[in-house]
Design a protein with these regions (language model features):
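A beta-strand-loop signature enriched in Asp, Gly, Thr, and Trp
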Residues: 231-268, 272, 277
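Extended ligand-binding groove/face enriched in aromatic
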Residues: 57, 66-180
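Fungal-biased detection of long, low-complexity, Ser/Thr-
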Residues: 258-336
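Well-ordered alpha-helical scaffold segments within catalytic/enzyme domains
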Residues: 1-3, 60-73, 114-132, 173-185, ...
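Low-complexity, Ser/Thr/Pro/Gly-enriched N-terminal "stalk/linker" regions
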Residues: 1-48, 92
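Extended, well-ordered alpha-helical scaffold segments
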Residues: 4-15, 74-90, 129-154, 186-204, ...
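Solvent-exposed loop and edge beta-strand segments that line ligand/cofactor-binding
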Residues: 3-5, 41-57, 97-114, 157-170, ...
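Loop-centered beta-sheet repeat module
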Residues: 150-223
Length: 336
């Protein structure tokens, strides 16, 4: 499944508007002294838009994916202009410098880090077909390298995973980072993720799916874990692991979540949960045996969740529109 041209046009329109919109802005910034002239664009010249830093990163990823799939989009030239400005050597140097500041070692760890790596993976995939994508990838490389190294240190240090359905999920971060590691040829990162995933999740059995979702989830802790294990385990080993992890099937994970208020920034996460469940299930299905009776059921549930979340990806309140289209793009296919 791919993003059709009509959807891509709408997604591009929303992403362009968001990545260039400086306010409103949710700053995650530790002050070590008087703030001075603290504006989003001055602090983060590449990723100042889309409400917060990580959303700005993954909406840039969305733009790259869209022009990769549809080079003739009506907004293609506007996308190139924005990427030229935001993914410049100078802008990325400032983003790198930010991580050297006092108390910033954990800034956007691991979610924002992983999205930078996935953005770089998408640029590298496109670079073989477009010279400007090579230029953008070259500019982003110092930040991607820095965050890949920091992620390696983090996952080596961590004796336990973070098993929640929000930004700090280690499984989600590792899925995106693994894609980057494979595309960029970062064998150390790939190996570290494989080791960590086995350590954290390899013995997991009977996932507590009855406890999902939490009210602000945009990821399923169980499904994103299964999706990561699908990426790192050999097929037969994964199939055996999945039997033990979901011995009674999907249970309540098969039902799209109820979203009580799409103008509430936390509750709007639940539309993202529908989209990320669809993404995870579609990836998991590709590893099931051809005669596995779960294939049709998992696919139908993925379709149900996509139908629940996709209509809300663009055109709604800003608390959803500044990020949801990225997750719709994940659900609609392709790497990672």
């Amino acid at each position: 499944m791919t993003i059709d041209r009509e959807l891509a046009t709408g997604f591009a329109r929303a992403a362009l508007a968001n990545v260039t919109l400086e306010y409103p802005r949710k700053l995650d910034h530790l002050l070590a002294g008087p703030p001075g002239d603290l504006t989003p664009k001055k602090v983060h010249p590449a990723f100042y838009g889309s409400y917060d830093w990580h959303s700005a990163v993954h909406m840039h990823w969305l733009l790259v994916r869209l022009v990769g799939e549809h080079p003739d989009l009506p907004q293609a030239q506007a996308v190139a202009r924005v990427l030229d400005e935001h993914l410049s050597t100078r802008a990325i140097a400032t983003e790198c410098e930010y991580f050297d500041g006092p108390g910033r070692r954990t800034f956007e760890r691991p979610y924002g880090w992983a999205w930078v790596l996935e953005l770089q993976a998408e640029l590298l995939r496109l670079a073989g077909r477009r010279g400007d994508a090579r230029r953008w990838a070259d500019a982003l490389e110092p930040l991607a390298t820095l965050l890949a190294e920091q992620l390696c240190r983090f996952i080596r240090l961590a004796p336990y995973p973070i098993r929640i359905g929000m930004h700090s999920s280690t499984a989600f971060a590792c899925i995106l980072a693994l894609d980057y590691g494979r595309v960029a040829g970062d064998k150390v990162l790939v190996a570290d993720i494989g080791t960590a995933a086995r350590k954290w999740y390899g013995e997991d059995r009977d996932a507590p799916v009855g406890y999902e979702p939490s009210l602000a989830d945009f990821l399923s802790p169980a499904l994103v874990e299964a999706q990561l294990m699908r990426e790192i385990l050999p097929l037969q080993e994964f199939r055996s692991w999945l039997e033990g992890f979901l011995p009674r099937g999907l249970g309540p994970l098969a039902t799209p979540p109820t979203v009580p208020d799409r103008t509430d920034a936390q509750l709007a996460h639940l539309d993202g949960l529908s989209l990320s469940r669809a993404w995870a299930l579609r990836r998991i299905v590709t590893a099931l045996a051809p005669d596995d009776p779960r294939r049709d059921g998992f696919t139908a549930v993925a379709d149900l969740h996509l139908a629940a979340g996709l209509p809300h990806a663009v055109g709604g309140d800003y608390v959803g529109e500044h990020w949801l289209a990225s997750f719709a793009a994940l659900a609609l296919g392709g790497s990672p």
